[in-house]
Amino acid sequence: ATLTSKTSTVDTFKANSGVFPFTTDSKSFALRLDHRATDSHQLFLRYNYTLSDDENENTRALVGFTRSTNTHILDSGVVGGWTFAASPNLINETRLQWNYRNFFVRPNEPNGPELNISGYGFFNRDIFLPSLSIERRYEIAEALSYSRAQHRFKFGMNLLLRGNNSD
């Protein structure tokens, strides 16, 4: 069969035929430090880092190369804590946390327009892309525990602040 459409349409079909590479690159790092300053003071600090890049991960069957995407994820976070035992019956715990995450999804075809042909294929930029999200998270937690005989009382608070900027 011969395609009789405009040259640009025929070129789109040719560019979206065949086998396309799928590459992924992921790096992760974590570090935790624990310190017992005294019998009543214990500290910890943990840092996590992940960087991940994927290309053409959704190219398959009817999804053409021009519709496929490239994703970039960066996730970085720190959490620290302090436990203070004022007495065997009275313990105070404090935790602080910070996290930054970006999740970027970019199309291979940045200009569009979206072209969907049922039963044949999906081409060009998805209507909802690119998607660029940045999330930030801050958390403070405080807990005071008191034990007496068979009873245990726990008081505390948790403050969580989150922000999400999506384009």
Predicted regions: what they are:
Residues A1-D167:
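Short acidic-glycine motifs
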